[in-house]
Amino acid sequence: MAKKCFCISGKIFALNLFGKRYSKKIIKKRDLKKYRLYLHPAVAVDGIIEKDNKILLIKRKNNPFKGCFALPGGFVECGETVEEAVVREIKEETGLIPKVKSLLGVYSSPDRDPRGHVISIVFILDVIGGELKAGDDAKEAEFFDLNNLPKLAFDHEKIIKDYMRWKNG
């Protein structure tokens, strides 16, 4: 899961050094000694969209938790903000066009994802367009009554409980 760098034609492609963006910067192997490379957790985003006391969930097409329901979301790609990532992931998985409304929270338990240490940043979003249709790595996309949710993947049950506390404030 933890990737520091990889080789391109005998040179090193550094993705992130000391928290600064070095997008597509090629660094010679001998110059890499100047930098200390660290293993980092992966960063993911999840989105909460509510409509008529129902919450949008997707059925996962792939492992981990294949066949389980989850909040729509995924990994942040290099060069995008977390807000851009959550909008992209929701478009890809549900067909809806969302707009970020608020930050709900950050979930960072090292064991929340069986693939490794993944930090998830969770946003509350409004729908501004699109049509609900499962896509990308979502087998299904549908709204579920907040009082009758299916078994959820990862720590998404905790996230939804936190959302309900935020909502009822």
From Swiss-Prot:
Residues at the active site: 140 (proton acceptor)
Classification of source organism: Archaea, Methanobacteriati, Methanobacteriota, Methanomada group, Methanococci
Reactions listed under catalytic activity: ADP-D-ribose + H2O = D-ribose 5-phosphate + AMP + 2 H(+)
Temperature profile: Thermostable.
Motif (Nudix box): 74-95
Protein name: ADP-ribose pyrophosphatase
Coiled-coil blocks: none
Nudix hydrolase domain segment(s): 38-168
Protein species of origin: Methanocaldococcus jannaschii (strain ATCC 43067 / DSM 2661 / JAL-1 / JCM 10045 / NBRC 100440) (Methanococcus jannaschii)
Source organism superkingdom: Archaea
Cofactor(s) annotated in UniProt: Mg(2+)
Residues that hold Mg(2+) 1 according to the record: 73, 93
Gene: nudF
Enzyme nomenclature, EC number: 3.6.1.13
Residue sites binding Mg(2+) 3 per the record: 89, 93, 142
Keyword Metal-binding: yes
